[in-house]
Regions:
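Acidic/histidine-rich catalytic cores of soluble enzymes
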Residues: 3-5, 19, 31, 70, ...
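Conserved, mostly hydrophobic/aromatic
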Residues: 7, 24, 32, 60, ...
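Active-site beta-loop-alpha junctions enriched in small/polar residues
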Residues: 8-12, 35-39, 72-75, 132-134, ...
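Short, acidic/polar
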Residues: 13-24, 107-117, 215-224, 276-278
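Catalytic domains of carbohydrate-active enzymes, especially glycoside hydrolases
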Residues: 18-38, 122-123
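Active-site acidic/histidine proton-transfer and metal-coordination neighborhood
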Residues: 23, 62, 79-206, 304, ...
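Glycine-rich, proline-tolerant flexible connector loops at the mouths of alpha/beta enzymes
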Residues: 35-57, 131-138
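C-terminal helical cap(s) of enzyme catalytic domains, especially alpha/beta-barrels
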Residues: 303-323, 330
Length: 333
């Protein structure tokens, strides 16, 4: 059976839930990965209003869609981050509160616990998202990092996320971290450290997204192979990395996405540098049968055109694994 092809609604949060569901169906998708921002899925309402979950399920059914995951990247970011003014623009007012760091982190952690509970009520087994990181600002070790600075960051991550993951365990939901710059895990080495910091508990895995590895020169196929049993969700997303030197390198030069001076940028699926044939074969080898969720980003392309072509691209690319050895027919019986 082909894997379901879904659309992540995070980049469509300016549209009402009913509208993006109708569009996703018209684009050819089997379902959606619902963002917990905009009006798409509101965690507080899901837990306080018995009719809210039914209203969401009714809209999905009306359009013949399934929901395979919900995502709460924005609130998750605040759990471990060093909180500053930037977070105010991405957090609900009830999470931001007075903006004091300890309070924001505490409220964000509680919201992630509630996100697991809301996912269970919706009948969803995976929550994708971010963790934030207290040590991301120390990525480039100058002035030199004291020896305990980074290990303390992983300990802080475990202190914040183990209680959250206890709730995930209680309700039978898994958390899938999207390894990404600014998170506790952003490549293979940091992902290994994050898993170990949590004692290798099974409720913590990854929302695999190759686009965030290609511009770092990380082995994005090797990531699947390394964490084959922890790939809980997959983002289909592409990025272009220039083969030639550019004015702004991997760090971005403080210039916006879409600027031609950048060394890399996100592109519609199949138009960047990711080898999706290799990705698909590695996912097959890993036994991944979950959704292939299109996170569509391309600042130079109309998003409806892009979402439609991305759906078709994934369908052409996906294929079932073989149940036989191709050369078995050569044997004499």
């Amino acid at each position: 059976m082909p894997r379901p092809v879904t659309l992540f609604t995070g980049q469509w949060a300016d549209l009402p839930f009913e509208v993006i569901c109708a569009k996703a169906k018209s684009f050819g998708y089997d379902g959606i990965e619902v963002a917990c921002w905009g009006d798409h899925f509101e965690v507080d309402k899901a837990l306080s209003n018995e009719r809210y979950i039914k209203s969401r399920l009714d809209v999905l059914a009306q359009h013949g869609l399934q929901c395979y995951a919900i995502s709460n990247h924005l609130v998750g970011q605040a759990v471990c981050d060093n909180i500053d003014v930037r977070h105010k623009s991405i957090l609900p007012a009830r999470i931001w509160g007075d903006g004091k760091e300890d309070g924001v982190r505490t409220r964000a952690a509680a919201e992630m616990m509630n996100t697991a509970r809301a996912a269970a009520k919706l009948g969803v087994k995976v929550v994708a998202g971010f963790t934030g990181s207290s040590i991301w600002p120390y990525l480039y070790s100058f002035p030199p990092n004291p020896p305990e600075l980074v290990p303390n960051g992983y300990r802080h991550f475990a202190e914040m996320w183990n209680p959250i993951l206890n709730v995930f365990d209680e309700v039978g939901v898994r958390f899938a971290l999207e390894a990404h710059p600014t998170e506790i895990a952003f490549d293979i080495a940091s992902a290994e450290a994050a898993v170990l910091a949590l004692g290798s508990r099974k409720s913590f895995g990854f929302n695999y997204d190759p686009s965030h590895f290609v511009y770092q020169n990380v082995d994005y196929v090797g990531f699947i192979q390394k964490f084959a049993d922890r790939i809980y969700h997959v983002h289909m997303k592409d990025a272009y990395l220039s083969p030639r030197p550019t004015e702004a390198g991997v760090f971005g030069g403080h210039i916006d996405f879409g600027d031609a001076r950048r060394a890399w940028d996100f592109r519609s699926l199949g138009r960047g540098s990711v080898d999706f044939e290799a990705v698909m074969r590695a996912l097959n080898d890993a036994g991944y049968t979950g959704p292939l969720s299109v996170e569509w980003e391309d600042g130079k392309m109309d998003r409806e055109h892009g979402a439609r072509e991305a759906c078709a691209f994934v369908r052409r690319l996906d294929f079932p694994t073989s149940a036989i050895a191709f050369d078995a027919a050569f044997e004499r019986k």
